[in-house]
Each structure stands twice: as C-alpha cells, then as structure tokens.
C-alpha cells in the first residue's frame, strides 16, 4: 500500500482537475516571450529590422540614443507595450505629449515607423510595435559599440496611453537618488541596476532647459567643472528663445557607447543634476567608481538590466493587440 495518506474529504483528483482548468486562465494574459517568436510567422523579421536601423543610424547618428531613450520611457509606464508611440487625438492626450516626453527625438519614432512599414509588407499583422521598439533598441545599441543582449519577443501592443500618468513614473533631471530609485524599484530594479541603466547617457543629448538651472544665478552648481560650465553657458545663452538647443550627455565620446559617462562624473562633467548626484550619493558612488574603471562590469550589468527592462509589464493576447499602425490603436475609440 502506498505511504501517501489523505485527510478525510480530500480528493487529489479534484485538485488536479481544478489545476488543469485554472492554469490556462492564469497564463492567458501573460505574454510568453522567446527569442525565436517570429521564426515561422515572420522569418525575415531580424533582417528587416537590422537593415532599417543600419540605414537610419548612418543617416542620423543620434538615432541610437533616441531609440534607447524611447524604449526606456515606454517600459517604465504601463510596461513595454508601445504606449509611448500612440498619437494624441481629439479625445485623448497621449503619453508622448506630456511635458516630460516632449523632447523624445523624432528620429526614434521614425525608425519604428520605417520598420513597421517594411514588416507589414513582408508579414502583415504579425509583428507588434512593442517588439519592433525592443529589437531596434538592441540592434542600435550594439551598432554604436554597446553590449549585446538577448531580446525575447512576443509582446503585444497596449490599449492605453495617458499623458497624465507620465509624471511620477519617469525620472526627472532634478530628482534625488531616493526619488529616482523609487521609480526604478517599483519596476523591480535594484540600485546597482539603476546606475547601470543610467549609463545609457553615454550617448545622446539633453536640451538646455533640462540643466540650465545648474548654470545660472544663485543656484548655479559650483561642482561642475569650470571649463565645462563656461562652455555650457555659452551654448545655452539663448535657450529661452530656442528650446531646441542641446548638449551631448557625454562630452568626450558622444557617439560611442562606452564607460566614459562614469569617468566624466568623476571629473565634474555630468550634464544633468540627476547624473551628478550619482557620484555624490554614498549609495550610488561605489557603482560609478566600479563602472568608471571597469567597462566590462558596466557592459555586463547593463546587458542584464536591459534584458530585464524588456520584460517589464509586457502584455499578452487579452491585454494587447498587434497594431496596424504604431501611432494608433486598432480600435480608434479606445
């Protein structure tokens, strides 16, 4: 006789039946991501993305940084569901039109549109905009010298994009380390992962309005490298009448993904206040020191954090769709 004993009224077969019924319900809304998701349904997916990003990056070298930033802003609000791509219409102000997102580069939106157009000709109605943004980001990061990381696919595009939800979910340039980490933490990221992802500022640029308060008046930051501060003051002197004026986040190697961002922080060359505080705060300084001296450690941590970022809040079939156009929901009344 078996040694297994069951209490009175306990029927294991009923439990097994319940699990069999409930399991599909539990998993139905969860996207199952895998790297070969489009192998059969859109076999040219990787080729089409790679060719499009190569052409665009050659034409406009800031595309990589812009797309990386767009991906981050997408994933940190409502998850990686392409909600940041939705255009505002007469009955909804979308995420991309919130003040915190108004400087998201047009080239980043453009590359997603280019890829979507090509994919719709090759395999219509198959590839989500969320997957396009994720894959394009990885390919562009590696193109400019950054680390390779796996991109698992199978995300669906979300049904919601609300501008009023942006604030409090995307870090701001003047926030403290605890404030910024609070945003990262609720998305499952540690302090070390936060610093690693901040290293994305090794490429790209920021507009003067995002750091001008560090340059002028009684609140001017005395810890900025004096020569750097003087150059920024000259660059931004007309920023109130021309809000397109911008400076490179990494003044030394702005187009190369490397660990120079962290080296710059130690020299007083951090552009944003939120950059500079990483070297000032005792909780984040050890990671800045590590990455400044060990690019391999930075690349490894960044790659792992990016793989993790790509899984934040992904949508399954019930909670998402494959949009026909990345800037509109399929149901325009949503």
UniProtKB/Swiss-Prot annotation:
The keyword Endoplasmic reticulum does not apply. Substrate binds at residue 171. The active site is at 73 (proton acceptor). GO terms for cellular component: extracellular region. It comes from the Eukaryota. It catalyses: 2 a phenolic donor + H2O2 = 2 a phenolic radical donor + 2 H2O. This is Peroxidase 65. Its EC number is 1.11.1.7. GO terms for biological process: hydrogen peroxide catabolic process; response to oxidative stress. Ca(2+) 2 binds at residues 202, 250, 253, 258. SUPFAM superfamilies: Heme-dependent peroxidases (SSF48113). Belongs to the peroxidase family. Classical plant (class III) peroxidase subfamily. Its cofactor is heme b; Ca(2+). It holds the Pfam family peroxidase. The gene is PER65. Residues 1-28 form the signal peptide. Its main location: secreted. Removal of H(2)O(2), oxidation of toxic reductants, biosynthesis and degradation of lignin, suberization, auxin catabolism, response to environmental stresses such as wounding, pathogen attack and oxidative stress. These functions might be dependent on each isozyme/isoform in each plant tissue. Heme b binds at residue 201. Keywords: Calcium, Disulfide bond, Glycoprotein, Heme, Hydrogen peroxide, Iron, Metal-binding, Oxidoreductase, Peroxidase, Secreted, Signal. Ca(2+) 1 binds at residues 74, 79, 81, 83. One of its GO terms (molecular function) is xylan 1,4-beta-xylosidase activity.
């Amino acid at each position: 006789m078996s040694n297994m004993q069951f209490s009175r009224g306990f029927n294991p077969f009923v439990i097994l039946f319940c699990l069999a019924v409930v399991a599909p319900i539990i998993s139905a809304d969860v996207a199952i991501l895998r790297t070969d998701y489009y192998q059969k349904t859109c076999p040219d997916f990787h080729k089409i993305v790679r060719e499009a990003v190569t052409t665009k990056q050659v034409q406009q070298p800031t595309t990589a940084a812009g797309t990386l930033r767009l991906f981050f802003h997408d994933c940190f609000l409502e998850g990686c569901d392409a909600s940041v791509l939705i255009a505002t219409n007469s009955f909804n102000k979308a995420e991309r039109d919130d003040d915190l997102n108004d400087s998201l580069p047009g080239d980043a939106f453009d590359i997603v549109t280019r890829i979507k157009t090509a994919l719709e000709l090759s395999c219509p109605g198959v590839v989500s905009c969320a997957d396009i943004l994720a894959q394009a980001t990885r390919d562009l990061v590696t193109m400019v010298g950054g680390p390779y990381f796996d991109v698992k696919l199978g995300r669906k595009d979300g049904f919601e994009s609300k501008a009023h939800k942006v604030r409090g979910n995307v870090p701001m340039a003047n926030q403290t380390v605890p404030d910024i980490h609070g945003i990262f933490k609720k998305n499952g990221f540690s302090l070390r992962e936060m610093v690693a992802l901040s290293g994305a500022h090794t490429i790209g640029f920021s507009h003067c309005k995002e750091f001008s308060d560090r340059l002028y008046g009684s609140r001017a930051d005395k810890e900025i490298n004096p020569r750097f501060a003087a150059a920024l003051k000259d660059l931004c002197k007309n920023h109130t009448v021309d809000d397109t004026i911008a400076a490179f986040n990494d003044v030394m190697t702005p187009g190369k993904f490397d660990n120079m961002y962290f080296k710059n922080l130690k020299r007083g060359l951090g552009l944003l206040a939120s950059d500079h505080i990483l070297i000032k705060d005792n909780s984040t300084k050890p990671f800045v020191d590590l990455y400044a001296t060990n690019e391999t450690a930075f690349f490894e941590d960044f790659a792992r954090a990016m793989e993790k970022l790509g899984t934040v809040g992904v949508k399954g079939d019930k909670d998402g769709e494959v949009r026909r156009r990345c800037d509109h929901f399929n149901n325009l009344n949503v």
